[in-house]
Amino acid sequence: MMRTLITIHPLPLLLLLQQLLQPVQFQEVDTDYDLPEDKREEFEEYVEQFFSTGPTRPPTKEKVKRLLLIEPGMPLYHVDYCNSEIMRKNVYYKHRCVAEHYFLLMQYDELQKICYNRFVPCKNGVRKCNRSKGLVEGVYCNLTEAFRIPACKYESFYRKGYVLITCAWQNEMQKLIPHTINDLVEPPEHRSFLSEDGVFVISP
């Protein structure tokens, strides 16, 4: 059982283990773990975010691709889509579950172009978002149980609509890049839901 957990969720479990073992007054974080090269940078980012008391790192292209974009595979309307992908992609903030999250079925270049579209009102008090010109398929994840990793449980909602994003200037790339997904707004003719029998339907 423990081997299975470590294989599926290596980064969150390493963070929790380190927090339990180190003395409270210990200030420096040892990140010299025997991790594959493609996971080392990701783990160091989690360590910095986990112990930092300041603002989070600015977005990067690789971070956006890793956390927000998905490839065809598991059906987007699968009831456990969010639970599976959030664990697989290690979508957390410090040691807590995120309250909501979006996964988009699109390429990064398509998402990045939205940063140059016109501004529209956002939700949750955000003043300006950029809206996609076409409909985008994705999944909205809403936290339903627990608040600390790795016990996060989510309800999954398939959506096909206009994606609203915020963007930030990236100095190294000298261009705007996607920062957060604010919403995925379905037009009335594309409202989708699960029936009482758990069957995915699209209203006419």
Curated annotation (Swiss-Prot):
Keywords: Disulfide bond, Glycoprotein, Secreted, Signal. GO terms for biological process: defense response to Gram-positive bacterium. One of its GO terms (cellular component) is extracellular region. It is found in: Secreted. SUPFAM superfamilies: RNase A-like. InterPro entries: RNaseA, RNaseA-like_dom_sf, RNaseA_domain. Disulfide bonds join 97-152, 115-167, 122-129. Residues 1-26 form the signal peptide. Coiled coil: none annotated. One of its GO terms (molecular function) is nucleic acid binding. Transmembrane segments: none annotated. Belongs to the pancreatic ribonuclease family. Does not exhibit any ribonuclease activity. This is Inactive ribonuclease-like protein 9. The gene is RNASE9.
